[in-house]
Amino acid sequence: MTKKAIIPAGTSKPIAPFVPGSMADGVLYVSGTLPFDKDNNVVHVGDATAQTRHVLEAIKSVVETAGGTLDDVTFNMIMIRDWADYAKVNEVYAEYFAGEKPARYCIQCGLVKPEALIEIASIAHIG
């Protein structure tokens, strides 16, 4: 197995020992992605719609850096802080995955920073 770290330009320094993406034999694993700026501050505090868009743009950047597109994403794991944001998350999500939808699950849970309303991890098959 060949494994390669995928780190888009301008990515914030991880707050733990991990990389934004790891590619192994054509499968890209995108780490849990939070609505952080380059300095690991939460962006769009209190706005689930904007945080979801920020997270999906970051995931798109990882996938594109690996040579793929969001059409290559086959699975998403979504974690939201408040179930009341579920409809807002789905509205933005549908914009990014307009064609063939990936499998996914969504759970409500606490996240690493209290201002973060969403985290998404993804799997994509590229190539």
From Swiss-Prot:
Keywords: Hydrolase
UniProt GO BP: nitrogen utilization; uracil catabolic process
Catalytic activity entry: (Z)-3-aminoacrylate + H2O + H(+) = 3-oxopropanoate + NH4(+)
UniProt keyword Nucleus present: no
Entry GO terms, CC: cytosol
Matching Gene3D superfamilies: RutC-like
Pfam families hit by this protein: Ribonuc_L-PSP
Origin: domain of life: Bacteria
Keyword Glycosyltransferase: no
Gene Ontology MF: a single term: deaminase activity
PANTHER family per UniProt: 2-IMINOBUTANOATE/2-IMINOPROPANOATE DEAMINASE RIDA, PROTEIN HMF1-RELATED
Cited function: Involved in pyrimidine catabolism. Catalyzes the deamination of 3-aminoacrylate to malonic semialdehyde, a reaction that can also occur spontaneously. RutC may facilitate the reaction and modulate the metabolic fitness, rather than catalyzing essential functions.
Protein name, UniProt field: 3-aminoacrylate deaminase RutC
Gene source species: Pseudomonas syringae pv. syringae (strain B728a)
Lineage: Bacteria, Pseudomonadati, Pseudomonadota, Gammaproteobacteria, Pseudomonadales
